Amino acid sequence: MVQVNGNYLKLKAGYLFPEIGRRVKAFSSANPDAALIRLGIGDVTEPLPLACREAMKTAIDAMGTAEGFHGYGPEQGYGWLREAIAKNDFQARGCDISAEEIFVSDGSKCDSSNILDILGEGNKVAVTDPVYPVYVDSNVMAGRTGEAGEIGRYAGLTYLPISADNGFAALIPSEPVDLIYLCFPNNPTGAVATREQLQAWVNYARANGALILFDAAYEAFIQDPELPRSIFEIEGARDCAIEFRSFSKNAGFTGTRCAFTVVPKGLKGKAANGEAVELWGLWNRRQSTKFNGVSYIIQRGAEAVYSEAGQAEVKALVSFYMENAAIIRRELTAAGLTVYGGEHAPYVWIKTPEGMDSWGFFDHLLNKANVVGTPGSGFGAAGECYFRLSAFNSRANVDEAMARIKAL
């Protein structure tokens, strides 16, 4: 009989969001008339920007002609999209990033997991707690951890707790680590990092030969122009960081699928014999072997994000969701709850009421208010007694959800 990958057997009972789905399904089966409002999974709800839709329609029509047909595209992405990304997202903010260092993909979740393909199994990994579960689970699947302990933490990982007590800013590790996952604006807490905080991480990484895996999927939601949107705004980051970005949340591409990863040329790791190896070449080889590229039609839609009309429409989308976040913050505060986040991110991080843990609060809101959120403990042990609500929904649903919660 064929053997399975035993690392998958280390995974806890279920990925957070499928477990939420299971509980919601059971509730809906027992209460078929309940009008659920879902503020849990961070999926967007508003239509794709018109500029993106029109660009994709034009691309579809072109595909119907001999002259405009496109088959397999470059695994790294079409040059015109990579140029637009480099110019608008990085060079415009003073970052020394070229188009050749941009790798277009179908999702930052995929990239933040697949990057492990080019990194050695012996690397010591650090993650914040709470943390986006994919960072942890992908390392478990790749064999970089031991078993999970009683509170769900895996042996072999270095956990960096973040909470209200430390301003949701993880302390620099006291011991050397090799891989550091950072996400700002943060999922799930909604916290942001200052230039000084990111500079400290870059300094640590350079001093210890570590690699920062920087998830900037929510950078478009930052409201303060003085806050950094990219790790590459920080001096020295080209020597120690890879950045993941996505069109999912700013432009509504969750169902359309387009993202990108930035791997600077000159960024190096070491081989088993100690020889320095450029990570750009390894990632390029990995993508060329395991990835067929994002469709031409979708990439034309992503390119339109950088048009004048696209920029205006994306800005309006982001503003809409941030207004939702402001409503959630205001109404929950008025209801007597302690809330964080929601100012530079589409997530509001809530302290659960006294005597109620994360899943208890989940069940309370589900059963009493018919509102679905995300238990903080699902993001890690330090997320216990916290709860995440997402601003990704219609205004009517957000208003109704807040009215229901305030009525409890």
UniProtKB/Swiss-Prot annotation:
Q: In which pathway does it act?
A: Amino-acid biosynthesis; L-lysine biosynthesis via DAP pathway; LL-2,6-diaminopimelate from (S)-tetrahydrodipicolinate (aminotransferase route): step 1/1
Q: What does this protein do?
A: Involved in the synthesis of meso-diaminopimelate (m-DAP or DL-DAP), required for both lysine and peptidoglycan biosynthesis. Catalyzes the direct conversion of tetrahydrodipicolinate to LL-diaminopimelate.
CDD domains linked: AAT_like (cd00609)
The UniProt keywords, alphabetically, are:
Aminotransferase, Pyridoxal phosphate, Transferase
Q: Which SUPFAM superfamilies match?
A: PLP-dependent transferases
| Keyword Transferase attached | yes
What Pfam families does the annotation carry?
Answer: Aminotran_1_2
InterPro entries per the record? Aminotransferase_I/II_large, DapL/ALD1, PyrdxlP-dep_Trfase, PyrdxlP-dep_Trfase_major, PyrdxlP-dep_Trfase_small
Query: Under what name is this protein listed?
Result: LL-diaminopimelate aminotransferase
Name the protein family. Answer: Belongs to the class-I pyridoxal-phosphate-dependent aminotransferase family. LL-diaminopimelate aminotransferase subfamily.
* The protein's required cofactors: pyridoxal 5'-phosphate
EC number(s): the record gives 2.6.1.83
- The gene from which this protein is expressed is dapL
| Organismal lineage | Bacteria, Bacillati, Cyanobacteriota, Cyanophyceae, Synechococcales
Which GO terms of the molecular function aspect are on file? L,L-diaminopimelate aminotransferase activity; pyridoxal phosphate binding
**Catalyzes what?**
(2S,6S)-2,6-diaminopimelate + 2-oxoglutarate = (S)-2,3,4,5-tetrahydrodipicolinate + L-glutamate + H2O + H(+)
Output the GO biological process annotations, alphabetical, semicolon-separated. lysine biosynthetic process via diaminopimelate, diaminopimelate-aminotransferase pathway
What assembly does the database describe for this protein?
Answer: Homodimer.
> Where are the N6-(pyridoxal phosphate)lysine residues found in this chain?
249
Biological source species:
Synechococcus sp. (strain CC9605)
Query: Is Transcription found in the keyword set?
Result: no
Which residues of this UniProt protein bind pyridoxal 5'-phosphate? 72, 108-109, 132, 187, 218, 246-248, 257, 292
Task: Summarize where substrate binds, as residue positions.
Answer: 15, 42, 109, 132, 187, 292, 388
